[in-house]
């Protein structure tokens, strides 16, 4: 009996030793995970719908992951290539859908605008009828006649005139880009370029995380849908955020949001920025402000058809600040416009600032890879300081 008791105690002793070793391993792994977690910079991309948030994420993949070779930059080249091929095939369909939506939206708007727009060539009416007839066809297979009709309509001066009034209806930003490329997109062996993939518009629904590394520093970037019904999901991402990148479509000063076809898009962005800046959960989180779509803003300002003061009367009294630094060769009208928009946001951050968080504005063009590379490099020091402050190391 005594021997049996000692044997049992030995078993217990071995079991306890094994348990202690297992606990040590778990504790070591937890400490390692904690170190990795604390060393990771978590960036939350916020902004109103169609401001360019998802395009910023795509640029991070081009610059810091592995381009569009799979979601996570796989180490296995074959797996990466397989993912890349599958993703690009999906994107071809998305690009074709963008092209179809663009021509449908423009020709459908022609009769609805006040005053309406007529075709320059009335013989193209049968082409309009065709485009409208396939508008709601599910799983559309893009036959050759679709491209033929779309191209002929895009070359019609009446359709172009309707496109010029696109601020009066809801049209995706990439409409002209893909309509100009009909002959390329229609090819059976068409493979999208990085620029095509950057321009492609797909509505973001839910929360998407992109992980990348820059100079051995880990970044997690969270892209959240910007439409009003998506914003209730944002609160899920607020915990342990290093910084917020707030993206604004600067060119949207003469447009209205899709959700109600009434609210000015830039005013919506200003209201949203104010609510985030004053949010009690975010009072210590600084905001990097991406004043995006500078290329489209410049086009609108120089075209002179939609004046900012018609939508924001205070612009008439605005003068370009002395510390403004225009881009080389930039028209003074463009400089004045972009700094006015910048200062509208800075008025919000300075009016309610308590010194616990700051706003860092940058002028961006999300489809320009070099611009985003330069801006993100400029932001890295800011993000690093925020991260050190977050863990009270600064």
Swiss-Prot record:
A lipid is attached at residue 3 (S-palmitoyl cysteine). Residues 1-23, 68-90 are annotated as: Disordered. GO terms for biological process: adenylate cyclase-activating adrenergic receptor signaling pathway; adenylate cyclase-activating dopamine receptor signaling pathway; adenylate cyclase-activating G protein-coupled receptor signaling pathway; sensory perception of chemical stimulus. GTP binds at residues 47-55, 197-204, 223-227, 292-295, 366. It is found in: Cell membrane. Residues 219-228 are annotated as: G3 motif. Pfam families: G-alpha. The keyword GTP-binding applies. Residues 8-23 have a biased composition (Basic and acidic residues). Residues 42-55 are annotated as: G1 motif. Mg(2+) binds at residues 54, 204. GO terms for molecular function: adenylate cyclase activator activity; beta-2 adrenergic receptor binding; corticotropin-releasing hormone receptor 1 binding; D1 dopamine receptor binding; G-protein beta/gamma-subunit complex binding; GTP binding; GTPase activity; insulin-like growth factor receptor binding. Residues 288-295 are annotated as: G4 motif. A lipid is attached at residue 2 (N-palmitoyl glycine). Residues 364-369 are annotated as: G5 motif. Residues 39-394 form the G-alpha domain. It is a lipid-anchor. Keywords: Cell membrane, GTP-binding, Lipoprotein, Magnesium, Membrane, Metal-binding, Nucleotide-binding, Palmitate, Transducer. Signal peptide: none annotated. Residues 196-204 are annotated as: G2 motif. GO terms for cellular component: cytoplasm; heterotrimeric G-protein complex. Heterotrimeric G proteins are composed of 3 units; alpha, beta and gamma. The alpha chain contains the guanine nucleotide binding site. Interacts with CRY1; the interaction may block GPCR-mediated regulation of cAMP concentrations. Interacts with ADCY6 and stimulates its adenylyl cyclase activity. Interacts with ADCY2 and ADCY5. Stimulates the ADCY5 adenylyl cyclase activity. Interaction with SASH1. Guanine nucleotide-binding proteins (G proteins) function as transducers in numerous signaling pathways controlled by G protein-coupled receptors (GPCRs). Signaling involves the activation of adenylyl cyclases, resulting in increased levels of the signaling molecule cAMP. GNAS functions downstream of several GPCRs, including beta-adrenergic receptors. Stimulates the Ras signaling pathway via RAPGEF2. Belongs to the G-alpha family. G(s) subfamily. This is Guanine nucleotide-binding protein G(s) subunit alpha. The gene is GNAS.
């Amino acid at each position: 009996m005594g021997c049996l008791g000692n044997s049992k105690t030995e078993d217990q002793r071995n079991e306890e030793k094994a348990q202690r070793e297992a606990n040590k391993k778990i504790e070591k792994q937890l400490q390692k995970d904690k170190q990795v977690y604390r060393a990771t910079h978590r960036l939350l991309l916020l902004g109103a719908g169609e401001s360019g948030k998802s395009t910023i994420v795509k640029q991070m993949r081009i610059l810091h992951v592995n381009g569009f070779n799979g979601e996570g930059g796989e180490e296995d080249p074959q797996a990466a290539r397989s993912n890349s091929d599958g993703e690009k095939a999906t994107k071809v369909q998305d690009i074709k859908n963008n092209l179809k939506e663009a021509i449908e939206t423009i020709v459908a708007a022609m009769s609805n605008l006040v005053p309406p727009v007529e075709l320059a060539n009335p013989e193209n009416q049968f082409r309009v009828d065709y485009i409208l007839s396939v508008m709601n066809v599910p799983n559309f297979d893009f036959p050759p006649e679709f491209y033929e009709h779309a191209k002929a309509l895009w070359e019609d001066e009446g359709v172009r005139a309707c496109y010029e009034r696109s601020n009066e209806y809801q049209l995706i930003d990439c409409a002209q880009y893909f309509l100009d490329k009909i002959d390329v997109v229609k090819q059976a062996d068409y493979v999208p370029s990085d620029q095509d993939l950057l321009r492609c518009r797909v509505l973001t629904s839910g929360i998407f995380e992109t992980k990348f590394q820059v100079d051995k520093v880990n970044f997690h970037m969270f892209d959240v849908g910007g439409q009003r019904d998506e914003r209730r999901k944002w609160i899920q991402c607020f915990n342990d955020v290093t910084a917020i990148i707030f993206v604004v479509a600067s060119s949207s000063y003469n447009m209205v949001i899709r959700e109600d076809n009434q609210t000015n898009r830039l005013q919506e962005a200003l209201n949203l920025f104010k609510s985030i800046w004053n949010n009690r959960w975010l009072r210590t989180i600084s905001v990097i402000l991406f004043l995006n779509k500078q290329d489209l803003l410049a086009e609108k300002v120089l075209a002179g058809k939609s004046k900012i003061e018609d939508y924001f009367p205070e612009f008439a009294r605005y003068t370009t600040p002395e510390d403004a630094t225009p881009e080389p060769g930039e028209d003074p009208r463009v400089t004045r416009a972009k700094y006015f928009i910048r200062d509208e946001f800075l008025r919000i951050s300075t009016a309610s600032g308590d010194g616990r968080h700051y706003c860092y504005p940058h002028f961006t063009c999300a489809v320009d890879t070099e611009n985003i590379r330069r801006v993100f490099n400029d932001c890295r020091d800011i993000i690093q300081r925020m991260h050190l402050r977050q863990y009270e190391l600064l």
